[in-house]
């Protein structure tokens, strides 16, 4: 559909050279994306990631099963957080055939005690926001520029604020450059519904075809110049490299080998910041030629520096103001009593049937766990707070809880509606090999 739309755009803009050039660019980009995804990788991107991982070019780590906010879940019951961690670990093992070294804490959300669950999952390291390490007990001797081991074992690395600000901030950082593509100006809102055709499907929405650059903070936007945008990305990559080298040089004067950890949401690169992948490629290529410092991973750093300080990190997130307010305020706090009731019921059912169960009981308990895990996704609370899709987020979470409750009530009454169970299994079929015994 997008290829067809850009072909129509090529014809529509044939007398407008700059717009025609942009239409050609999008036609070529979407055509190449389709060739790569369909022809080269047979619609199986996991195989591509497996190849990159096995060749040593990419380290992939695990995360919680459905991006549940672990500090809140752990406060409800230990089993709630434990299942998120261990199911996430199990999925990683199924996909890659080995246990993960690292673990991404959703929203970098940490509370003391979580590391015991990570240790149970055999995780060697995780990432905190800077204040999680800085306010640890005792204070870290090397600030945020070296990891610290937690009392239970796994090492905690801290996010570097300087590099995060330079890349993440749309106002202070690179993505706000006037040459870069404007995210919010899209032909999905500019062109007629008839011309958009199947891309629109009857409603206005982002199509991914955008002809304008950021230009400035006003509403007037100039046409996008791809060459100028790529040049800006290359300059920013050079600047980022120079800033990191200056940082490393200054820190190294204190007599240790520092690591700068720069984690970002993947959606920044290519989605919000269209030129982000160009920036990454330029930075990686330039760094590959450096002799003064190099790219590394937390696993490689720990292997080279096995002796580090032991501290208890502080409760922290990378959300607004560094705590849980985004996911726990008057707009969304009501969800947690529902989630707590559900996990208590899940744990009771799991304990009752932990030793032995029939095939139908196993199916029901797996589906109850799926619905609970899906209801626990932190995205729902985030969207309620952000007001961007509050109704959708509320409906999604309540639908999962409604299916959980209906199925649980049938289970307790020994009156399973197998047609309803099959419908639930068809709707929510994530984690086919899920172990519900983690709730015991």
Question: What is each stretch, according to the model?
Answer:
Residues 78-105, 243-263:
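CE4/NodB-like, metal-dependent polysaccharide N-deacetylase domain
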Residues 1-21, 138-440:
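Active-site and substrate-binding clefts of carbohydrate-active enzymes
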Residues 99-110, 265-269, 389:
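Conserved short loop/turn motifs at secondary-structure junctions
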Residues 1-64:
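N-terminal catalytic cores of secreted or lumenal carbohydrate-active enzymes
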Residues 109, 114-123, 139:
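Hydrophobic, small-residue-rich alpha-helical packing segments that form membrane-like cores
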Residues 64-66, 102-111, 131, 298-303:
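Short, solvent-exposed turn/loop segments enriched in Gly/Ser/Thr/Pro and often Arg
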């Amino acid at each position: 559909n997008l290829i067809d739309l850009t072909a129509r755009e090529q014809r529509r803009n044939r007398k407008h050279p700059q717009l025609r050039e942009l239409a050609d660019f999008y036609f070529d980009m979407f055509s190449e994306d389709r060739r790569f995804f369909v022809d080269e990788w047979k619609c199986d991107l996991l195989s591509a990631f497996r190849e990159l991982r096995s060749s040593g070019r990419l380290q992939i780590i695990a995360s919680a099963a459905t991006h549940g906010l672990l500090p809140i879940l752990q406060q409800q019951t230990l089993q709630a957080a434990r299942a998120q961690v261990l199911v996430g670990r199990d999925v990683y093992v199924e996909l890659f055939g080995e246990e993960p070294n690292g673990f991404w804490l959703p929203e970098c959300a940490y509370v003391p005690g979580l590391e015991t669950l990570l240790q149970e999952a055999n995780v060697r390291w995780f990432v905190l926001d800077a204040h999680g390490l800085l306010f640890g007990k005792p204070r870290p001797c090397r600030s945020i520029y070296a990891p610290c081991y937690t009392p239970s074992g796994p090492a905690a690395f801290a996010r570097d604020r300087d590099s995060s600000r330079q890349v993440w901030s749309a106002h202070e950082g690179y993505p706000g450059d006037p040459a870069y593509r404007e995210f919010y100006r899209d032909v999905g809102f500019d062109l007629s519904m008839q011309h958009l055709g199947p891309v629109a499907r009857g409603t206005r929405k982002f199509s991914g075809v955008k002809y304008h650059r950021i230009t400035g903070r006003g509403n007037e936007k100039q046409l996008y110049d791809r060459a100028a945008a790529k040049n800006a990305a290359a300059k920013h990559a050079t600047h980022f490299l120079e800033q990191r080298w200056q940082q490393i040089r200054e820190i190294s004067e204190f007599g240790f080998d520092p690591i700068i950890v720069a984690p970002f949401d993947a959606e920044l690169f290519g989605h919000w910041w269209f030129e982000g992948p160009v920036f990454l490629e330029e930075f990686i290529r330039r760094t590959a030629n450096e002799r003064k410092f190099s790219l590394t991973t937390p696993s490689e750093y720990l292997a080279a520096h096995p002796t580090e300080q032991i501290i208890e990190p502080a409760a922290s997130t990378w959300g607004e103001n560094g705590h849980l307010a985004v996911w726990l305020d008057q707009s969304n706090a009501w969800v947690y009593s529902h989630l707590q009731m559900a996990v208590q019921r899940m744990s009771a059912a799991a304990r009752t049937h932990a030793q032995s169960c029939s095939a139908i009981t196993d199916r029901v308990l797996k589906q109850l766990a799926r619905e609970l895990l899906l209801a626990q996704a932190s995205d729902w609370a985030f969207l309620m707070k952000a007001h961007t899709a509050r109704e959708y987020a509320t409906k999604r979470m309540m639908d999962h809880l409604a299916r959980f409750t209906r199925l649980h009530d049938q289970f307790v009454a020994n009156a399973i509606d197998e047609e309803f169970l099959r419908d639930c299994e068809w709707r929510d079929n994530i984690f086919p090999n899920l172990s519900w015994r983690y709730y015991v």
